[in-house]
Amino acid sequence: MSSGGLLLLLGLLTLWEVLTPVSSKDRPKFCELLPDTGSCEDFTGAFHYSTRDRECIEFIYGGCGGNANNFITKEECESTCAA
């Protein structure tokens, strides 16, 4: 195979990897945790993955504590947990 063909194949494989959604078996276990507002009172918007709704949902986070199912952006939540 020519170097151009190998480069094209590499590009297609990379694109496939990026666009393939996370399957539930590959999803980190912490994505199954319920949202936890934490123990502080610096209330800001955050996102958690809802296994019931199968999407990332905004919730109010207190700013400290909580659990790992807590993301600053919806995009970060989706890339980590969404199937």
UniProtKB/Swiss-Prot annotation:
GO molecular function, one term: serine-type endopeptidase inhibitor activity
Entry keyword Signal: yes
CDD domains, per database record: Kunitz_textilinin-like (cd22594)
SUPFAM superfamilies the UniProt entry points to: BPTI-like
Disulfide-bonded cysteines: 31-81, 40-64, 56-77
PROSITE patterns: BPTI_KUNITZ_1, BPTI_KUNITZ_2
Keywords: Disulfide bond, Protease inhibitor, Secreted, Serine protease inhibitor, Signal
Membrane spanning stretches: none
Subcellular location: Secreted
InterPro entries xref list: Kunitz_BPTI (IPR002223), Kunitz_BPTI_sf (IPR036880), Prtase_inh_Kunz-CS (IPR020901), TFPI/VKTCI-like (IPR050098)
Signal peptide: 1-24
BPTI/Kunitz inhibitor domain span: 31-81
A matching Pfam family: Kunitz_BPTI
Highest taxon listed in the record's lineage: Eukaryota
Organ and tissue specificity: Expressed by the venom gland.
Primary location: secreted
GO CC annotations on file: extracellular space
Family as reported in the entry's similarity comment: Belongs to the venom Kunitz-type family.
Function: Serine protease inhibitor. Does not inhibit plasmin, and does not reduce blood loss in the mouse tail vein blood loss model.
Protein name: Kunitz-type serine protease inhibitor textilinin-5
